[in-house]
């Protein structure tokens, strides 16, 4: 869904992407229709807290799909499907991949799609009722939110760090905590995302998820 002019997105020419137009007001009404209490959704930024509930909110749209997910709009993606296959995501029937709010993938099942509701009685910031009725951003999609609930749920997850978390305060491509790394990135239709690193005088090529 987008509130932008769909015609201008046709330049992407992506056969596996379907764009649907929906105003923010109509989206708010759609989200509200899924809950029996008055939600707080005054600005698009608050949607960060609702991302983990998309499997529940958009359950009609997701019928027929085995998995769903979300990611930030400034993420440069590698070959997601190849990555999941290489790490036996489907073979092991993992319920979720993800560590941070950059990108997460969920199995499309009723049990998994309701995990975000399981924080009642734990603490204030993990109770979805508190999260969805407050104007405050709870970073519910991050490590101190949905991650805690999935750890408690007992579902099997793919949890290793397969991404490069780039420090946006520097011009050069460095991860948080790195000092003067020597790294370049390239992307191609054939090979996806590739990082070229100079480590101890040797060139090391990696294929991060993002």
Predicted regions and their residues:
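Conserved short acidic donor-positioning loop in nucleotide-sugar-dependent glycosyltransferases
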Residues: 2-6
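Short catalytic/ligand-binding loop motif for oxyanion handling, primarily in non-cytosolic enzymes
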Residues: 7-11, 28-29, 76-80, 85, ...
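Active-site-proximal specificity loops/subdomain of glycosyltransferases
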Residues: 8-63
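Residues that flank catalytic or metal-binding motifs in active/ligand-binding sites
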Residues: 15, 71-73, 99-102
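GT-A fold catalytic core of metal-dependent nucleotide-sugar glycosyltransferases
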Residues: 50-93
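A short, conserved acidic/glycine-rich loop-to-beta-strand motif
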Residues: 89-105
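Catalytic core and acceptor-binding pocket of nucleotide-sugar-dependent glycosyltransferases
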Residues: 113-210
């Amino acid at each position: 869904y987008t509130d932008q002019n769909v015609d201008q997105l046709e330049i992407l020419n992506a056969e596996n992407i379907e764009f649907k137009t929906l105003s923010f007001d109509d989206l708010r009404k759609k989200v509200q229709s899924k809950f029996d209490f008055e939600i707080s959704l005054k600005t698009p930024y608050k949607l960060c807290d609702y991302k983990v509930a998309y499997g529940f909110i958009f359950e009609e749209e997701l019928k027929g799909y085995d998995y769903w997910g979300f990611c930030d709009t400034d993420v440069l993606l590698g070959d997601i499907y190849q990555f999941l296959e290489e790490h036996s995501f489907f073979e092991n029937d993992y319920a979720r991949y993800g560590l941070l709010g950059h990108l997460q993938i969920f199995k499309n099942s009723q049990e998994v799609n309701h995990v975000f509701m399981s924080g009642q009685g734990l603490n204030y910031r993990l109770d979805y009722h508190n999260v969805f009725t407050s104007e405050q951003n709870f970073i519910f999609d991050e490590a101190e939110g949905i991650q805690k609930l999935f750890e408690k749920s007992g579902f099997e997850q793919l949890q290793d760090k397969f991404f490069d978390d780039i420090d946006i305060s520097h011009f050069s491509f460095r991860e948080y905590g790195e000092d003067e790394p020597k790294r370049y990135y390239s992307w191609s239709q054939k090979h996806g995302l590739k990082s070229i690193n100079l480590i101890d005088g040797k060139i090391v090529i990696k294929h991060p998820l993002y």
